[in-house]
Swiss-Prot record:
It holds the Pfam family Ribosomal_L29. Belongs to the universal ribosomal protein uL29 family. GO terms for biological process: translation. This is Large ribosomal subunit protein uL29. The keyword Ribosomal protein applies. The gene is rpmC. One of its GO terms (molecular function) is structural constituent of ribosome. Keywords: Ribonucleoprotein, Ribosomal protein. CDD domains: Ribosomal_L29_HIP. Coiled coil: none annotated. It comes from the Bacteria.
Length: 63
């Protein structure tokens, strides 16, 4: 998810997407621990999405 897409989301949507992304990251980590992922770069991509969403959510809560 791009930063421009993240900025367009409401706070409720940010929280929902953050939950989904954290779950996806957890699932990917578990799958990678059991057997190597075909595309391990997915881990980095999802982790960065989680960080992007969490940063935007924190920024909005402080305003």
């Amino acid at each position: 998810m791009k930063q421009s897409e993240v900025k367009e989301l409401s706070v409720a949507e940010l929280q929902e997407e953050l939950g989904k992304s954290r779950k996806a990251y957890s699932d990917l980590k578990m799958a990678h621990a059991v057997s190597p992922l075909e595309n391990p770069i997915q881990l980095r991509t999802v982790r960065r999405d989680v960080a992007r969403l969490a940063t935007e959510l924190t920024k909005r809560e402080q305003q």
